């Protein structure tokens, strides 16, 4: 054999005798069990998982952990919809949970949710709520979620145990957990079924606050209540006679609801129909409102903007930046008679990303003229534009006269160097409660302020988008009405129904009304 062949042969023998470093290390019994349980969970094989569990608890080699119990409990709770497995899943699930607790292992949120679902499937809402309360009282890193409470709440509502359902809701509220449509509908249904008219009123407003458009299932619950005998017996106890108070409440709430209680007398008229493009109900001819944020929300929004703007400027280590924003606040206080705020940079730079493209003052001028034309009070809007941009425009002889005219007329404010003009135009629009013309989606601001729900509502009411097609301007004004549940000062209700395509012209609305003082030819003198 040649020397080279001998060397290769020896090297091969040595390598084959050495362990392969890339070879998978054998798993310990606990890891093996968890792997197999996860496989059973994916395939929804409850029987196989229980067999693995039974073998593990009789073995001295396996020590069950929280993950093992969690996987088993999840699989049990996921099997309760299968009639053939329901009893097995419930019985073994409770057995597994008892062993978990007796072993000194604290259940996490996922495990508690699974046990609550098992208890609810058994019809034991008390136990479902008990395990959640015990979990919350212990505290820790894992916190309850809507899904943790839902089994107990829905179980109580289904069994018409209204007071217990309300107790669960109170516990959720204390934990900072908001209801969603399924839970609100369940509470609405049990309240209607047990004749609690004040609770029905409360949960209708919960739907308005958290849901917007309702599902067909929820609509049926609402319809059954208003068509029922109890709803017709509920009067307004004189509330409806104080029309001034109701109108003021609607105004303070931002439009679309007053929240003072049932208004009107007698049976309700329930109709399903459509709403015109201008917001006129085609069933009762009532004009739907364009719902804005209320006074408290708006002021909180303005205060948040000021705080965030100041904080950003402080982080820039400039001793002047807080002063200049305060100067703008003072200036706006003196000159703040505007119906619209214009994001100058957004409009001037629109579609200018081409060779030789620059700031288009003509586009900005078109927007200004159109807003002035559409203003019923012949008012010019206010442009917010960075001082550097204003300086450049003033240096251009073609633009100088127009820009100087805007400045002298108080319709152009130059934001100072080192400042983000976004904060200026957003603050101005919020403070003055007026329109904001920009195509900016403002995604950077949403999560820093009051949350996406509030900010989305504010944008829907105040943001004006625009397009230029072949140089022709088109402004996209906010909708003349809001597609949300509405309660009028007359006591009528309008419920928009969820639809797949969200096409407003074909959306079904349920219109609910009855006789009120505003329908009477004479009043008691309280109507202003």
Swiss-Prot record:
Keywords of this entry: Hydrolase, Magnesium, Manganese, Metal-binding, Nuclease, Nucleus, Repeat, tRNA processing, Zinc
Bias (Basic and acidic residues): 1-16
Impact reported for residue 440 to A: Abolishes ribonuclease activity
Entry-linked Pfam families: PPR_long (PF17177), PRORP (PF16953)
CDD domains listed in its UniProt record: PIN_PRORP-Zc3h12a-like (cd18671)
Residues the entry annotates as binding Zn(2+): 281, 284, 494, 511
InterPro entries membership: PROP1-like_PPR_dom, PRORP_C, TPR-like_helical_dom_sf
Physiological role: Endonuclease RNase P responsible for the 5' maturation of tRNA precursors. Preferentially binds precursor tRNAs containing short 5' leaders and 3' trailers. Also involved in the maturation of mRNA and small nucleolar RNA (snoRNA).
Protein name: Proteinaceous RNase P 2
């Amino acid at each position: 054999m040649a020397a080279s062949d001998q060397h290769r042969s020896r090297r091969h023998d040595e390598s084959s005798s050495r362990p392969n470093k890339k070879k998978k290390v054998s798993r310990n019994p606990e890891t093996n069990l968890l792997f197999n349980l996860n496989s059973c969970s994916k395939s929804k094989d409850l029987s196989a998982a229980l067999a693995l569990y039974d073998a593990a608890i009789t073995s001295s080699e396996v020590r069950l952990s929280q993950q093992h119990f969690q996987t088993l409990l999840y699989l049990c709770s996921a099997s309760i919809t299968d009639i053939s497995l329901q009893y097995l899943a419930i019985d073994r699930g409770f057995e597994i949970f008892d062993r978990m607790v007796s072993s000194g292992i604290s259940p996490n949120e996922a495990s508690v949710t699974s046990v609550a679902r098992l208890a609810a499937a058994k019809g034991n809402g008390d136990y479902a709520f008990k395990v959640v309360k015990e979990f919350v009282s212990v505290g820790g890193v894992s916190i309850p979620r809507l899904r943790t409470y839902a089994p107990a709440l829905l179980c109580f509502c289904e069994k018409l145990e209204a007071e217990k359902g309300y107790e669960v809701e109170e516990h959720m509220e204390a934990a900072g957990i908001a209801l969603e449509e399924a839970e609100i509908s369940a509470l609405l249904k049990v309240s209607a079924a047990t004749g609690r008219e004040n609770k029905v009123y409360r949960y209708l407003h919960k739907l308005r606050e958290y849901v917007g458009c309702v599902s067909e299932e929820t609509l049926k619950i609402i319809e059954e209540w208003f068509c029922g005998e109890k709803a017709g017996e509920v009067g307004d106890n004189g509330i409806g006679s104080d029309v001034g108070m109701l109108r003021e409440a609607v105004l303070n709430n931002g439009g679309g609801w007053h929240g003072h209680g049932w208004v009107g007398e007698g049976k309700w008229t329930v109709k399903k129909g459509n709403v015109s493009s201008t917001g006129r109900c085609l069933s009762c001819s009532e004009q739907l409102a364009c719902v804005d944020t209320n006074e408290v929300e708006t002021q909180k929004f303005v205060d948040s903007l000021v705080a965030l703007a100041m904080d950003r400027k402080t982080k820039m280590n400039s001793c002047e930046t807080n002063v200049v924003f305060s100067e703008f606040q003072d200036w706006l206080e003196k000159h703040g008679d505007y119906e619209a705020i214009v994001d100058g940079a957004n409009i001037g730079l629109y579609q200018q990303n081409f060779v030789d493209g620059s700031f288009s003052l003509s586009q900005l001028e078109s927007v200004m003229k159109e807003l002035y034309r559409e203003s019923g009070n012949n008012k010019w809007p206010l442009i917010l534009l960075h001082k550097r941009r204003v300086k450049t425009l003033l240096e251009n002889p073609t633009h100088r006269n127009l820009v100087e005219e805007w400045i002298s007329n108080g319709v152009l404010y130059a934001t100072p160097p080192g400042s983000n003009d976004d904060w200026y135009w957003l603050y101005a629009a919020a403070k003055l409660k007026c329109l904001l013309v920009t195509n900016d989606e403002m995604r950077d601001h949403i999560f820093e302020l009051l949350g996406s729900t509030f900010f989305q509502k504010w944008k829907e009411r105040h943001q004006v988008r625009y397009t230029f097609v072949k140089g022709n301007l088109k402004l996209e004004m906010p909708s003349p009405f809001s597609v949300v549940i509405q309660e009028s000062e007359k006591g009528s209700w309008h419920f928009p129904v969820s639809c797949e395509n969200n096409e407003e012209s074909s959306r079904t609305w349920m219109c609910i009304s009855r006789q009120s003082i505003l329908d009477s030819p004479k009043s008691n003198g309280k109507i202003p």
